[in-house]
């Protein structure tokens, strides 16, 4: 989910900038807030998650995706904690976090925690089939317990408990 990755990037850059880069800091701060505000309009009203292709809600093959939703939750929650976003934005991060847990976090037949709804891989270029089409994005495997989904959820959880 590209929008979530942009939110993380902007928030990470802001955290490392010093006062000597005031104008650059202000520009990236504005981009971060703009990216979050743009993403909010695509947040699923029921679950708080984001669809694999965010502007194609309900298209057959599209699904609520764990890694992007968790990245968004993490970026927003940390952005609020560090003062980069207004406190009212915390509700959007919490909704994405809880929605992901409610929909995809459970216990498997062996009694182990299981996180599902994770896109195994998606990208553009390289192999000829990575053409950016809906068919391509919807054809990528959806997996369980992959680090690309588990790690962002744990990062978001960390922000949930330290605020």
How should these model regions be labeled?
Residues 1-8:
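Short, small-residue-biased leader/transition segments that mark boundaries at the very start
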Residues 4, 24-28, 43, 52-70, ...:
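Solvent-exposed loop and edge beta-strand segments that line ligand/cofactor-binding
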Residues 5, 31-34, 71, 92, ...:
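Charged catalytic carboxylate motif
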Residues 8-16, 74-81, 155-162:
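Short glycine/serine- and small hydrophobic-enriched flexible loop segments
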Residues 13-26, 79-88:
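Inter-helical turn/loop segments and adjacent helix faces that build the functional surface
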Residues 28-47, 92-110:
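Long, well-ordered core segments of solenoidal/helical folds
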Residues 41-52, 126-130:
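Acidic-glycine-rich active-site phosphate/pyrophosphate-binding loop
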Residues 64, 80-163:
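CBM-like carbohydrate-recognition segments
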């Amino acid at each position: 989910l590209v929008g979530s990755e942009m939110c993380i990037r902007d928030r990470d850059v802001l955290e490392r900038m010093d006062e000597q880069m005031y104008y650059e800091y202000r520009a990236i701060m504005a981009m971060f807030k703009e990216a979050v505000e743009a993403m909010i309009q695509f947040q699923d009203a029921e679950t708080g998650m984001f669809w694999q292709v965010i502007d194609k809600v309900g298209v057959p093959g599209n699904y609520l995706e764990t890694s992007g939703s968790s990245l968004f939750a993490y970026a927003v929650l940390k952005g609020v904690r560090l003062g980069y976003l207004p406190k009212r934005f915390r509700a959007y991060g919490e909704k994405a976090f809880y929605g992901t847990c409610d929909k995809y976090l459970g216990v498997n037949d062996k009694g182990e925690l299981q996180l599902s709804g994770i896109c195994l891989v998606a990208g553009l270029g390289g192999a000829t089939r990575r053409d950016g089409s809906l068919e391509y994005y919807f054809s990528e495997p959806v997996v369980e317990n992959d680090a690309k989904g588990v790690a962002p959820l744990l990062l978001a959880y960390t922000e949930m408990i330290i605020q």
